[in-house]
């Protein structure tokens, strides 16, 4: 029998129960005990569903109230001093929430810990804060309590914990840089490893046989000092009485293969979706008795698996390893929606092409039975059904659009060039007449329950088109008047018609489909519902021109047209896997180019094309960066270069480290770039300073992910730090990101303060 297991299951719940419970607790609408009861119910349901699918060991430790890395950080007692946590006391839930979002029902508000992208995914983790001489201890009991929970329900368990070197790689501090470049972080291992040892001992004491220890850092470029550290660390952890399954994912081991194979662990998990070519080398390098966990079901996309291809790849290895070959998804299923059963509005054809977390476990079970030679006719029937679904998708006329193919054939001859920046900015300033330190926002304004109800009623047919349009126009006018009252210089229409910055555009583009309940966690309680790009992309009609033109008609101040860029739409969607991602991105760029040209023709003088996801698309290995950056930058320029020099092009990026891609950001040639910098205390600007970034820049002066209202003096100080690095005449003043998730009172207070900060700077 082939053992199948799972690296992690979506924690949010099929109906986003966790999001609702957590937000109700934050708002004081339910107690901590009620929140914990929701957590217990979700965990029990998730464990049972996995057990029903044939998972041999249910994962424990994949559940998190906010973020799984933050869970582990608090278990280690690594709480920054500003949160006022008493030394030696257990870390409570409200401290965890304050670290993640800056405030909680109890405890004083404090600056939240930094948040950034989880490798090359659209999930965000809370960055561990590291200090020289830091001490660690077991400071939370949740992991052990959840193990006992699962065991009491009759499950065999496999606790999942971040590996010590990956946790250090993810962390940073005033004295330590993020990543593997700072070997000084390795000095913390002496204090860290005894706590790992204690955790493993305690798990063994609970009867745990296997522990999954996640080390995705092993798929990255690592200095030799880090490779050496892996050997030393796991030599110490090998003394534990539990068996360690070391899990790598998101890419192949490549030049770290020898390091991984030399580690004294009982099993090794590898990603065979991203890196199938490594299978033979990994299998032949295993020690006698060592388990190979083959990640063959894609944990990051939603298409059905080609089980025939998987079997062809695995059969020779099965013959070699026998029962030592385990099967699993490529990575945690955190990155896909929970269950297709909730999709009652997708057509049957498209539904037959898809696989969410629950279905992926069923695929895994079927694959395991087929690989083990199960003679049950249902196995062959299941394989035949899978085969038929894949064939139907390949042959569907919905996939290919001849007009798109014709345009793609000629896209190489479409201009990507605009006039030089100096010439453009002079023309723009003569027309826009903006003051020094011009103020703006990133695009969205608070989405109230009333706005969400408007969209919901309109989509359900309860509201007529004309009634909906009138209501949205009213919302836009209120946002315009509010911005005028506050004193902002470049306005936005507030995006009341948009539920999501990607889904909105996908609904208006050909080649997209949308789920009813296909939610995945982005950060904390924030969930997103990625569109599905299943076929060729085209723009049947203008998407934003009507709303933007109406907003501009209400004011003499410039109103930004707001678009999501081609790379971000690509990155934040579930993308077809039957052609290169680059080709799909160029199709998106051509569609957006048409929209940009139409906005200019409608009198919109400032157009923002957001690309917050451009960095997350980077391959994990630096050797692969150039090819990606070349086509990503080219797609942005393809989408923006159809307008004249008087039209000002903005772009926005968030959660980004810019140092290593600053040349490519400059090559995008946006007139103004706005970035998230407040949580990093403006340290991101060093890249722009060192590079002598030539265009305008708006460093975010307050963190919109926290409900805390910033002090005016604090924002002034941040901008003075920015002005010390960059010419002040090229600086804009803006929040870190859009204001969609914030409430109106804090938004008004923050923007009034931000405008006051800009006026203080002008008067200096």
Swiss-Prot record:
Q: How is the cofactor bound?
A: Binds 1 zinc ion per subunit.
Q: Which GO terms describe its biological process?
A: methionine biosynthetic process; methylation
**Enzyme Commission numbers on file:** 2.1.1.14
User: Catalysed reaction(s)?
Assistant: 5-methyltetrahydropteroyltri-L-glutamate + L-homocysteine = tetrahydropteroyltri-L-glutamate + L-methionine
Q: Where does Zn(2+) bind?
A: 652, 654, 676, 737
Pathway(s) this gene product operates in, as recorded in its UniProt entry: Amino-acid biosynthesis; L-methionine biosynthesis via de novo pathway; L-methionine from L-homocysteine (MetE route): step 1/1
* Residues engaged in binding L-homocysteine: 442-444, 495, 610
Q: Which UniProt keywords apply?
A: Amino-acid biosynthesis, Metal-binding, Methionine biosynthesis, Methyltransferase, Repeat, Transferase, Zinc
Catalytic site positions: 705
GO terms assigned for molecular function: 5-methyltetrahydropteroyltriglutamate-homocysteine S-methyltransferase activity; zinc ion binding
CDD domains per the UniProt record, alphabetical: CIMS_C_terminal_like, CIMS_N_terminal_like
Q: What does this protein do?
A: Catalyzes the transfer of a methyl group from 5-methyltetrahydrofolate to homocysteine resulting in methionine formation.
- PANTHER family, alphabetically? 5-METHYLTETRAHYDROPTEROYLTRIGLUTAMATE--HOMOCYSTEINE METHYLTRANSFERASE
By what name is this protein known?
A: 5-methyltetrahydropteroyltriglutamate--homocysteine methyltransferase
């Amino acid at each position: 029998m082939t053992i199948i297991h799972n690296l992690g299951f979506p924690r949010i719940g099929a109906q986003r129960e966790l999001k609702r419970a957590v937000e109700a607790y934050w708002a004081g609408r339910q107690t901590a005990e009620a929140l914990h009861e929701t957590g217990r119910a979700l965990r029990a349901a998730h464990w049972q569903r996995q057990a029903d699918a044939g998972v041999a060991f249910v994962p424990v430790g994949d559940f998190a109230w906010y973020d799984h890395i933050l869970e582990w950080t608090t278990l280690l007692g690594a709480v920054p001093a500003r949160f006022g946590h008493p030394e030696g006391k257990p870390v409570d839930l409200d401290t965890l929430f304050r670290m993640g979002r800056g405030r909680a029902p109890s405890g004083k508000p404090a600056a939240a810990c930094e948040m950034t992208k989880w490798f090359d995914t659209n999930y965000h983790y809370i960055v561990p804060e590291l200090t020289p001489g830091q001490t660690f201890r077991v400071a939370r009991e949740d992991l052990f309590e959840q193990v006992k929970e699962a065991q009491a329900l009759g499950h065999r368990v496999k606790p999942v914990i971040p590996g010590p070197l990956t946790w250090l790689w993810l962390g940073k501090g005033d004295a330590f840089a993020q990543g593997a470049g700072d070997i000084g972080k390795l000095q913390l291992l002496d204090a860290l490893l005894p706590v790992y040892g204690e955790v493993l001992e305690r798990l063994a004491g609970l009867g745990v046989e296997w522990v999954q220890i996640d080390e995705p850092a092993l798929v990255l470029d690592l200095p030799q000092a880090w490779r050496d550290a892996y050997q030393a660390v796991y030599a110490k952890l090998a003394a534990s009485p539990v068996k360690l399954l070391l899990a790598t994912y998101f890419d192949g081991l490549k030049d770290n293969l020898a390091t991984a194979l030399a580690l004294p662990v009982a099993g090794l998990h590898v990603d065979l979706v991203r890196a199938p070519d490594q299978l033979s080398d990994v299998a032949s390098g295993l020690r006698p008795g060592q388990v190979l966990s083959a990640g063959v079901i894609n944990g990051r996309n939603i298409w059905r698996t080609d089980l025939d291809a998987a079997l062809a790849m695995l059969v020779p290895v099965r013959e070699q390893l026998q029962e030592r070959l385990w099967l699993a998804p490529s990575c945690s299923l955190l990155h896909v929606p929970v269950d297709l059963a909730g999709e009652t509005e997708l057509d049957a054809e498209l539904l037959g092409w898809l696989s969410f977390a629950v279905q992926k476990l069923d695929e895994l079970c079927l694959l395991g039975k087929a690989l083990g030679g199960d003679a049950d006719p249902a196995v062959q029937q299941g394989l035949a059904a899978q085969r038929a679904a894949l064939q139907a998708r390949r042959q569907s006329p919905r996939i290919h659009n001849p007009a798109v193919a014709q345009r793609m054939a000629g896209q190489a001859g479409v201009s990507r060039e605009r006039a030089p920046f100096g010439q453009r900015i002079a023309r723009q300033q003569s027309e826009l007449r903006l003051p020094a330190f011009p103020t703006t926002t990133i695009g969205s304004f608070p989405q109230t329950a009333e706005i969400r109800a408007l969209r919901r009623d309109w989509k359900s047919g309860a509201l007529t088109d004309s009634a909906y349009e009138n209501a949205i126009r009213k919302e836009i006018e209120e946002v315009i008047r509010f911005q005028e009252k506050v004193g902002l210089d470049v306005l936005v229409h507030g995006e009341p018609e948009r539920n999501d910055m990607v889904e909105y555009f996908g609904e208006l583009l050909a080649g997209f489909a949308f789920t009813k309940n296909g939610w995945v966690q982005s950060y904390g309680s924030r969930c997103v519902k990625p569109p599905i790009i299943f076929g060729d992309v085209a723009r049947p009609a203008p998407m934003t021109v009507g709303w933007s033109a109406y907003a501009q008609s209400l004011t003499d101040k410039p109103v930004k047209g707001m678009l999501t860029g081609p790379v971000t739409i690509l990155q934040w969607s579930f993308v077809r896997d039957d052609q290169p991602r680059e080709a799909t991105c160029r199709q998106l760029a051509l569609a957006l180019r048409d929209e940009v040209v139409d906005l200019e023709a409608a009198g919109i003088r400032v157009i923002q094309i957001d690309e917050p996801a451009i960095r997350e698309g980077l391959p994990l290995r630096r050797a692969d960066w150039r090819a990606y950056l070349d086509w990503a930058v080219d797609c942005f320029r393809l989408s923006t270069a159809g307008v004249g020099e008087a039209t000002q092009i903005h772009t926005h990026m968030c959660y980004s480290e810019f140092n290593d891609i600053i040349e490519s950001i400059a090559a995008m040639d946006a007139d103004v770039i706005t970035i998230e910098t407040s949580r990093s205390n403006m340290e991101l600007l060093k890249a722009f300073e060192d590079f002598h970034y030539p265009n305008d820049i708006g460093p975010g002066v307050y963190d919109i992910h926290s409900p805390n209202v910033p002090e005016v003096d604090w924002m002034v100080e941040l901008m003075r730090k920015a002005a010390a690095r960059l010419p002040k005449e090229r600086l804009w003043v803006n929040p870190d990101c859009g204001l969609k998730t914030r409430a109106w009172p804090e938004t008004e207070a923050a923007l009034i303060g931000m405008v006051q900060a800009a006026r203080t700077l002008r008067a200096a």
